[in-house]
């Protein structure tokens, strides 16, 4: 592996200081070039710890949030993972370095086409995508060991809980879809129902039902 460039090293050091300590997650972030997922006008900010616009009124998440969500998900290398909200594909690419198989759902077809081209370029052959309503999950491929949702919902989508394996973990932002009062939560599916652990205030775009005409 070639040596990481200084701006990547600076970002990794910042993430570690801010709580991303899982070495597998840090390694995945190091190996995925965020610049490939950022729009050209923002390339100079590709390795800054900030969210950036990507089109279709969506964003590529702040690297700290990507790191903390990936860490909270506790992904094992033999696991099957569902991601809701492919977006630029950056979070999916990081997860793909951690799991055996990743399924990712995106409602915006133009974003999905761009993300799939990036996955092909990076030879991430363990990612399968489709354009669909993310709130419904991917029932044909269920159950999943882990589920990550990258858009905020006012309540936990029941379909996603149904598609989670027993003892499975889901990480998602919950709260006001206007982005004022949201919190990342980690949900564990137990034989008694679900255990909910909030762990970080955030601001995400809303989880929207249906597929837009584009």
UniProtKB/Swiss-Prot annotation:
GO terms for molecular function: protein-L-isoaspartate (D-aspartate) O-methyltransferase activity. Pfam families: PCMT. The keyword Transmembrane helix does not apply. It is found in: Cytoplasm. The active site is at residue 61. GO terms for biological process: methylation; protein modification process; protein repair. Its EC number is 2.1.1.77. Keywords: Cytoplasm, Methyltransferase, S-adenosyl-L-methionine, Transferase. Coiled coil: none annotated. It is an enzyme of class 2 (transferase). GO terms for cellular component: cytoplasm. PROSITE patterns: PCMT. It catalyses: [protein]-L-isoaspartate + S-adenosyl-L-methionine = [protein]-L-isoaspartate alpha-methyl ester + S-adenosyl-L-homocysteine. Belongs to the methyltransferase superfamily. L-isoaspartyl/D-aspartyl protein methyltransferase family. Catalyzes the methyl esterification of L-isoaspartyl residues in peptides and proteins that result from spontaneous decomposition of normal L-aspartyl and L-asparaginyl residues. It plays a role in the repair and/or degradation of damaged proteins. This is Protein-L-isoaspartate O-methyltransferase. It comes from Paramagnetospirillum magneticum (strain ATCC 700264 / AMB-1) (Magnetospirillum magneticum). The lineage of its organism: Bacteria, Pseudomonadati, Pseudomonadota, Alphaproteobacteria, Rhodospirillales. The gene is pcm.
């Amino acid at each position: 592996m070639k040596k990481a460039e200084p701006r990547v090293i600076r970002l990794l050091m910042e993430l570690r200081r801010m709580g991303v300590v899982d070495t597998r997650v840090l390694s995945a972030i190091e190996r995925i070039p965020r610049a490939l997922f950022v729009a050209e006008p923002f390339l100079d900010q590709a390795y800054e710890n900030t969210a950036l616009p990507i089109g279709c009124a969506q964003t590529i998440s702040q690297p700290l949030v990507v790191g903390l969500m990936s860490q909270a998900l506790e992904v094992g290398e033999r696991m099957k993972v569902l991601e809701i909200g492919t977006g630029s594909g950056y979070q999916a690419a990081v997860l793909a370095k951690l799991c055996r198989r990743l399924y990712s759902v995106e409602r915006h077809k133009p974003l999905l086409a761009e993300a799939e081209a990036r996955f092909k370029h990076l030879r991430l052959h363990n990612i399968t995508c489709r354009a669909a309503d993310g709130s419904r999950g991917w029932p044909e491929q269920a159950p999943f060991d882990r589920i990550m949702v990258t858009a905020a919902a006012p309540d936990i989508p029941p379909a996603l809980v149904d598609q989670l394996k027993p003892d499975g973990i889901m990480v998602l932002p919950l709260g006001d879809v206007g982005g004022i009062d949201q919190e990342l939560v980690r949900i564990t599916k137990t034989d008694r129902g679900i255990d909910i652990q909030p762990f970080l205030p955030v601001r995400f775009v809303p989880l929207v039902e249906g597929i837009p005409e584009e």
